[in-house]
Amino acid sequence: MRRAPRLAASVVLSLASTVSVCTAQVTDVYRDPRMDFGSIQTVAVVPFANLARDQFVAERVRDVFINRLLSTEAVYVLPVGEVARGIAQLGIQSPSSPTPEDVVKLGAFLKADAVITGVVREYGEVRSGSTTANIISMSIQLIETGTGRIVWSASSTKGGISFWNRLFGGGGQPLNKVTEEAVDALMDKLIG
């Protein structure tokens, strides 16, 4: 008789654990209430800052981000080469963390309504005992080019070692899948 409530409780706990493992956490969302986001038609995505161990990870994550943003068809994303040309011609010293003045100059040069910057904080494999899994932690900022003001910002973390990884082993999802899910969670907050 007592087994039925315990079984039901364990099933509910299992489902809750599965759902929490399958979704990316989006935290620290800022949205400027005065900004008309409908006025943003063209965006430039500058190189992301990289705080992870792998030196090429920022470009990989930026590529996934640009592809996902293009697939929404919500805005026109300037080609990477055009953005790089603008950064070089304007002599922007730190393209991954531009000053408000740099954003205004770059926006005018590229005819972009906004500039997107990003930071990859963690990327790769994490280990706990004999269990490994992939993780990504990143943040994105949308900067309006008329003033150089941040009008939207959010962070996303996806992956890591779950209860199920510890219980059954395994390496979690492939790193590209984890990256896509983290970026998609950010897109839902930005576009949705």
Place the predicted regions along the sequence by residue.
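Bacterial N-terminal signal peptides that target proteins for export
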Residues: 1-12
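Bacterial N-terminal signal peptides
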Residues: 10-20
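C-terminal/domain-edge helix-coil "capping" segments
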Residues: 22-41, 106-110, 132-135, 143-192
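N-terminal segment of the mature soluble domain
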Residues: 40-47, 52-119, 149, 153, ...
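Short glycine/proline-enriched turns and hinge-like loops at secondary-structure junctions
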Residues: 57-58, 130-133
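Charged helix-capping and loop-helix junction motifs
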Residues: 98-100, 134-137
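Generic short beta-strand segments
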Residues: 119-124, 157
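Extracytoplasmic/secreted cell-surface and envelope-processing proteins
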Residues: 125-129
